[in-house]
Amino acid sequence: MDTRTFEIYLNIKMEKVHFKNRYGIELVGDLYLPENHAAQKNPAIIVAGPFGAVKEQASGLYAQQMAACGFVALAFDPSFGGESGGSVRNTASPDIFTEDYSAAVDYIGMLDFVNRNRIGVIGICGLSGMAITAAGTDTRIKAVATMSMYDMSRDMSRGHMDCYSEEQRAKIKDYLSQQRWRDAENGTFAPGNHEIDFDEMDEPLTAAMEVPAELPEGADPAFAAFYNYYYKRACHPRAVNFVSSWTATMPVAFWSFPLMANIKEVSPRPILLVAGENAHSRYYSEDAYKAANEPKELLIIPGADHVSLYDDMEKIPFDKLVQFFKENLK
């Protein structure tokens, strides 16, 4: 049964593929093939994200569209989620997710019909930071684009718009540390939230968020956008964002290992950062742009919010993406 959540192009062939990262975790991807792909060595695009999503959602939509424009394109599930391996489920790692991109480069660059010197990456939402981090070290990635970037290390350790006070950060660290004792004693990983809010007494809200059956009136616009994507038009049974919570201690690694510390080292390879004009996450792309060396470009999409760039074909600038990669994957 095909569980993709977007319109399927009948002229674009998709194959299920398997490959391993250097930790031995088997990753599963959907490989999208342009017409007449076997007749030549093609440029290739690797796509992952959003954070907690699966390849049957936004990354698959992007991969299929890029294949329709002449690229061999791979959308994959990062470790610990979707159809990919990893004995612990519903967790994430900045290191391993970064490695997953390079493992995808290993795989796609070995295909007979791919030019391994013409490989680019698209990172969506929370997989953007890993895409840039991978490109900073893996020079086989010749160009990188990010869509609706979310810096997950910064988000988890500093809060939205860096809102955590030092006292709040200390409380979160203590909660995560004590939760490790509880998990060790129980022999299981308790569910929790990767973004921790505080109550009126300035204590961390640690209970796993319960998603309402219907969107409440007056819901925060960002929450409403996520809800309408993950629970309505693009719901998928394997997506963490739909079926369950993350493991409570998952943020520990993101506190310890900041993403994109090597962003300047992507240069002289180009970076394209795309964000919605009205996105609550826009500042991540703007700050990454300031931190990166040339060549770099920041593209703000008028009227778009964060989730618009997941699946709104009128807002996603595919013409720009195609131009960017054709110019830089020569």
Residue positions per predicted region:
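N-terminal cap/lid segment of alpha/beta-hydrolase-fold proteins
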Residues: 2-40, 310
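Short beta-strand element of the alpha/beta-hydrolase
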Residues: 40-50
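The serine-hydrolase catalytic nucleophile loop
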Residues: 52-64, 78
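Catalytic nucleophile-loop/oxyanion-hole region of alpha/beta-hydrolase
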Residues: 55, 81-120, 311, 315-317
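Conserved alpha/beta-hydrolase
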Residues: 65-84
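Alpha/beta-hydrolase-fold enzymes
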Residues: 133-225
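Short beta-strand/loop motif that positions the catalytic acidic residue
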Residues: 266, 273-275
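Catalytic active-site module of serine/aspartate enzymes centered on a nucleophile-bearing elbow/loop
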Residues: 304-307, 311-330
